[in-house]
């Protein structure tokens, strides 16, 4: 039986994820007029562009909500954000610059916590503002049904009647004004923005054109570092981790993760740290483009990865990175709480993060330009005396290395025999002027 309702569920309670913006305001009032009983739920995710959270539920009641609740999701979001950092759950990168999956993390928290609040009010129909072309419609669908298996989904933007009557922002603004609310449509930006405490996403409209760059974006979590007139002074900052969790910035410990992340945002934001321009694959495989901000997570990740590489061996780091990319994709797809994601996350938290204790000192400059000045940890396996070129008591002797190299003869002989087999079968051809074989199609590429 379908869990998606295509018409207004008149006479029934409908929970709506309410942001206070024009879209959800018009949808809530429209549903009320069509006979539904709307309940409004607003997630406080520490959005940097939200000036007054308490005003949002009051708006919802004014527009016809039977009840309106503000759900503080910040502590949970902070915990999930640090879990993602510990596991390196970030798969979208361009030339080493990372997107920190801040929107998928926000959806995981919003989708579960709002639906849990709805269950408390005996509300089992949920609507939100996600469109059918995006990722969020699937993320919210999964998280909603994981939290409440009896949930039904009603999205006004999938209801043809709503689209016919209020198909655009101008129509919504006129509808609210006619209803006596005097709702003024805000000026259209050249892109849309979605944010939470961990980061901000700017996309759509002019940013869909690849000839429009980061320069058209007005950052909300930091400075426009690319502008010559914006002064950015170099700054030295220290980040301390204990068993994989960040605990102090510049020697100042913070009582909770929320406060620490907010302070990390302020520090990184002064430099425009963590901004990136990414082309990515949406869940439906179509490509989209976004400009991202995440100054705090970027700062913490620099320190965390420095400690990871100084503490763990190569094979552990390889597994951490491979699993992190897989976990990042699962997070992006709305599968953060699926068993396969929990397995990868728990492994990284237990066997990688728990050993990460120490402090990293970083010099921040402009944008993503930085230098690591010092790394201190009781768990470092980096020991310079082992490889020192000075005359010191080494961990091994020249004779030890001769023996190690001699043992390599076994696999070198095996490799030569395999190359000879490939040459006889025509896969390789003898190199010109060298004993090293060449691929048989090397000449064809010239």
Curated annotation (Swiss-Prot):
Source organism, top-level taxon: Bacteria
Pfam families: Arginosuc_syn_C, Arginosuc_synth
Keyword Nucleus on entry: no
Binding locations of ATP: 17-25, 43, 129, 131, 136, 194
Binding site for L-aspartate: 131, 135-136
Pathway involvement of the protein, from the record: Amino-acid biosynthesis; L-arginine biosynthesis; L-arginine from L-ornithine and carbamoyl phosphate: step 2/3
One term under GO cellular component: cytoplasm
Molecular function GO terms recorded: argininosuccinate synthase activity; ATP binding; protein homodimerization activity
Compartments where found: Cytoplasm
Keyword list, A-Z: Amino-acid biosynthesis, Arginine biosynthesis, ATP-binding, Cytoplasm, Ligase, Nucleotide-binding
Subunit and partners: Homotetramer.
The protein's name in its UniProt record: Argininosuccinate synthase
Organism encoding this protein: Variovorax paradoxus (strain S110)
Gene name per UniProt: argG
């Amino acid at each position: 039986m379908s869990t998606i309702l295509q018409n207004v569920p008149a006479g029934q309670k409908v929970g709506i994820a309410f942001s206070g913006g024009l879209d959800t305001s018009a949808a809530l009032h429209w549903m009320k007029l069509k006979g539904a009983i709307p309940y409004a739920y607003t997630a406080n995710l520490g959005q940097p562009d939200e000036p007054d959270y308490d005003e949002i539920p009051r708006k919802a009641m004014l527009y016809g909500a039977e009840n309106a609740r503000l759900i503080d999701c910040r502590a949970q979001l902070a915990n999930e954000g640090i879990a993602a950092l510990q596991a390196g759950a970030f798969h979208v990168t361009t030339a080493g610059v990372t997107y920190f999956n801040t929107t998928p993390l926000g959806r995981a928290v919003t989708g579960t916590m709002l639906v849990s609040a709805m269950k408390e009010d005996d509300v089992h129909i949920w609507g939100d503002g996600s469109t059918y072309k995006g990722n969020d419609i699937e993320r919210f669908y999964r998280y909603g049904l994981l939290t409440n298996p009896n949930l039904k989904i009603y999205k006004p933007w999938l209801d043809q009647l709503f689209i016919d009557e209020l198909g655009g922002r101008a129509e919504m603004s006129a509808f609210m004004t006619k209803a006596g609310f005097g709702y003024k449509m805000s000026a259209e930006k050249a892109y849309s923005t979605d944010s939470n405490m961990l980061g901000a996403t700017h996309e759509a409209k002019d940013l869909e054109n690849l000839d429009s760059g980061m320069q058209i974006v007005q950052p909300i979590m930091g400075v426009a570092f690319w502008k010559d007139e914006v002064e950015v002074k170099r700054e030295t900052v220290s980040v301390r981790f204990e068993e994989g969790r960040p605990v102090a910035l510049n020697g100042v410990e913070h009582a909770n993760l929320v406060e620490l992340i907010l302070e990390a945002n302020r520090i990184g934001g002064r430099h425009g740290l963590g901004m990136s321009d990414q082309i990515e694959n949406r869940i439906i495989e179509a490509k989209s483009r976004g400009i991202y901000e995440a100054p705090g997570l970027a700062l913490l990740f620099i320190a965390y990865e420095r400690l990871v590489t100084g503490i763990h061996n190569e094979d552990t780091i390889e597994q951490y990175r491979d699993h992190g990319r897989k976990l990042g994709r699962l997070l992006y797809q709305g599968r953060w709480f699926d068993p396969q994601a929990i397995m990868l996350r728990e492994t990284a938290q237990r066997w990688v993060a728990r050993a990460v204790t120490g402090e990293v000192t970083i010099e921040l400059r402009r944008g993503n330009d930085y230098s690591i000045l010092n790394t201190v940890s009781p768990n470092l396996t980096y020991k310079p005396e082992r490889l020192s070129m000075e005359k010191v008591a080494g961990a091994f002797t020249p004779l030890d290395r001769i023996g190690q190299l001699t043992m390599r003869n076994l696999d070198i002989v095996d490799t030569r025999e395999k190359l000879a087999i490939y040459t006889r079968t025509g896969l390789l051809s003898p190199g010109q002027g060298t004993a090293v074989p060449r691929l048989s199609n090397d000449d064809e590429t010239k």
